[in-house]
Amino acid sequence: MDMKKIAAFSSKQEAVCVKNDTIDDALFEKYGVNRGLRDINGKGVLTGLTRISKIVSFTSGPDGKQVPCPGELWYRGYNIKTLIKELGENEFGFEKTAYLLLFGEKPTESQLIEFQDILDESRSLPTNFTRDVIMKAPSKDIMNSITRSVLTLASYDESSTDSQLENSIKQCIQLIAQYPMLSVYSYHAYNHYDNDESMYIHRPRKGRSTAENFLAMLRPDQKYTALEAKVLDVALMLHMEHGGGNNSTFTTRVVTSSGSDTYSAMAAAMSSLKGPKHGGANIKVVEMMDDLKEHVDNWEDRVAIKEYLMKILKKDAFDRSGLIYGMGHAVYSMSDPREEVLNSFVEKLAKEKDMERDYILYKNVEELAPEAIAETRRIFKGVSPNVDFYSGLVYKMLNIPPELYTPLFATARIVGWSSHRIEELIGMNKIIRPAYKSVMKEIE
């Protein structure tokens, strides 16, 4: 295969594609197309109904008009802030919340014990799977490695294409339990073969929470503090679910509506989540903040920090995209409740990790970025930090490598994907097929 020849042809054809595939923005306005399935205010086009979660970002004013309000996130009728607040000091919430999202009701004590036991039993991979699938084809792109593993797991399942509800529930539970292993083992394989680091495979232990197992499998000595495990558990809870309209969950429902199997639906969702506009934003926040540290000597100098942020917005700094990563959200306007919850734990972790200077810098950017954006952009709703703003800092303080940031997101979000797959299977009667209007010119 002559790659230079193929690359040269592709480069030549790029301009042809741009010429023939560019559609005038005016046509989208003419035909009333909501690009990205969202209106000018960022509100999504209504495409379905769900009982799994609810996002609140607007409320009715005195005149009946919708006005922005502090953001709220509800799981199966329960406010996420309440779910986290109700946890005991040494109690983990991932498993309890997963049960709630999957089955629509809080588990009793006996139901939770049974569910935790099922997850423990499912925390294993087929014989030699780690060696034959994960270790033999390592990749720096851990999301690709996990996606490949998910599709390969179908080969070990005699009922892989059976999309009946009972079988799909079983498959979803197994994948939820296996995702931490797929993520961590894929990273270790890459780190060994690409970075020439030591290779070690720690097995998950029964009785440990998902957060505890993740940290133990990742670290050479398997050690972690109670606060580290608690903060990671909270982060996982906050990332589990975010409505049916987010890109990866909608992808799950689209693929499910076609009658496809669980493994294919989850692999498709993974392909969506790995996109930098969806699951990769927290990495960009960390990179942006690292760049800021290099260009601003005094991390408490708010004037210098704001000047740097203005340079970013003018495309004169960082990646020259004009974006301050971690600011704003497609749905929330006044506040992102997930960011508020995570923020309440960040300061404690920063003290434990002796990273208080980093935390102060983040707080300054959190306060100054909305001001800078308001001064340079025409905005249709408020701008506030989203969950990605602090999640990257949390993972950095937990010594989780950047290659695992998005896979960790997936480890949580697969619970939401599974819940929506189940709901789609129960209520499915039509394949999802939105309309596209052709503006092609006929050539005789």
Task: Label every model-predicted segment.
Residues M1-E444:
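Non-transmembrane, aqueous-exposed alpha-helical and coiled segments at domain scale
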